[in-house]
Each structure stands twice: as C-alpha cells, then as structure tokens.
C-alpha cells in the first residue's frame, strides 16, 4: 500500500494554514489554531480517527472564529482528497454514533466524490471556550465540500461542549472506518469504476 499522506497549505488575507495528514497514523497530533477548544476538538479527531495530524493556523481571530474554523476545514478536506488519491480499495461507507455523557452524535459518511451535507439538531449553548457552537456544524459542511464527502450528522444533548466533542469523535470514527482498506477489493468501490 502506498503512503496515504498529504501536506496542504492555504494562505488568504484572513488565514495562513499548514496541514499535514497521515490517514494510516497512530493518532499523533500537533494542533495550534489559536482557539483552545477547537484545538481540543482537532486533537480528539486525530486521536479517535488514528490520523496523524498537524495543523498550524494563524487566523484573524481579532474579528471572530469563523475564518479560522472554516479555512482549517477546507484545508483538512483538501488533505484528505490528496491523501486518498483515487480511493482504490477503501471501504467508502461508514456510520458511527458516539455518546458523551448526556449527549450523543451520529455521523454517516460516503467518500463519494459528491459533496453533500445534512445536519440534524441544535447546540445547547451559543459558544464553548472561544468557539462559536454553530461553527462545529460549519466545520463539517466545509470538510464535506472539500473532501468530496456525502455527510449526514446529528447531535442531541444538553451541553454544547459534550455535543460538539461527541460530533468530532463520531466524525473521526466514521472517517477512520470509511478510509480503511478492504483487502478483498483491488479496485474502487463504485460500479462507475471511479469516485
């Protein structure tokens, strides 16, 4: 199997981002976005997806968290696209439901090359530790659009910290499952012959 790794940079007037990704990693991460709670979520994503991940972001946090969260998701999505290349041998589909105390999140993913996003539920508080709660939903949408994922997510609970963390863990576990190589498959998991 070839290395499924990527290194992607994104520089705009709003953010300067460097991301490295190893899909077949051990869950090691080095994250610095300037938003402590977002760093915690990306670290959790790396840990539970067993992705080796580095994210360095210098964003316009003097304005708000929107550009930082969105642009990290865009860059991470591009990294997944690069690392998975032609997607040969991947399982493609996966779903996971993850609890965290009273909260539960679900993610259903298809690494289809056809970006589509649905979200069910609301976050219980407006923000957590410097991150606006609705940006967790926007992160998933931006990741979906830039990694070519059909992604259906949902959350339920009473504590936004728990809801968002369960969401990131569920996303990680789903992507870990969907990106795994099925040794029985030598081609792409599509009747079209490509994804």
Curated annotation (Swiss-Prot):
GO biological process terms, semicolon-separated: L-histidine biosynthetic process
Alphabetized GO MF terms: imidazoleglycerol-phosphate dehydratase activity
GO cellular component, one term: cytoplasm
Pathway entry: Amino-acid biosynthesis; L-histidine biosynthesis; L-histidine from 5-phospho-alpha-D-ribose 1-diphosphate: step 6/9
PROSITE patterns, per database record: IGP_DEHYDRATASE_1 (PS00954), IGP_DEHYDRATASE_2 (PS00955)
EC numbers: 4.2.1.19
Major location (coarse): cytoplasm
Pfam family, one: IGPD
Keyword annotations from UniProtKB, A to Z: Amino-acid biosynthesis, Cytoplasm, Histidine biosynthesis, Lyase
Secretion signal span: none
Domain of life: Archaea
Subcellular location: Cytoplasm
Catalysed transformations (reactions): D-erythro-1-(imidazol-4-yl)glycerol 3-phosphate = 3-(imidazol-4-yl)-2-oxopropyl phosphate + H2O
Protein family membership: Belongs to the imidazoleglycerol-phosphate dehydratase family.
Protein's UniProt name: Imidazoleglycerol-phosphate dehydratase
Lineage: Archaea, Methanobacteriati, Methanobacteriota, Stenosarchaea group, Halobacteria
